Amino acid sequence: GSVAQVGNGTFIWPVPQYTYCSRWYSSGHKGVDICAPAGTPIYASASGVVTRAGYERGGAGTGYGNSLIIDHGNGYSTLYSHCLSLTVSAGQAVSQGQLIGYVGSTGRSTGNHCHFEIRHNGRYLPPQNYFNK
């Protein structure tokens, strides 16, 4: 479904009506890619504070492009990248389901998608283990 229990919190799928087109792999791909047309809205998976928002070239070939990280507390955070544009900025508090950006293909990307990661205390968690997409 579009709602998942992660730790003590409830997270929602950030790009409703679209599923992932590339899954999490332990070696290099630390999230899922949600393929959707350019300009499709992306929503905050859970409430929190935006800790980083902007264009990231990244090291080691990450190249997240327009991306943001939301700190949800209790060691949990989510990352959304390759966005066409962002609607929030660092330091801003966001609510679950709030518009945070739009699907795009910025940075090291081969097509329109939202790269979505869930992290807990610096560890990457495979989103497909929590969402039935």
Give the residues covered by each predicted segment.
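Surface-exposed, glycine-biased beta-strand/turn segments
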Residues: 1-66, 96, 125
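A residue-level detector for short acidic-glycine micro-motifs
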Residues: 23, 36, 52, 82-85, ...
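Short hydrophobic beta/alpha edge segments that flank linear recognition/processing sites
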Residues: 34, 66-70, 95-109
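Ser/Thr-centric signal marking residues that sit
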Residues: 40, 78, 106, 110
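Zn2+-dependent peptidoglycan hydrolase active-site motif and core
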Residues: 45-90, 112-120
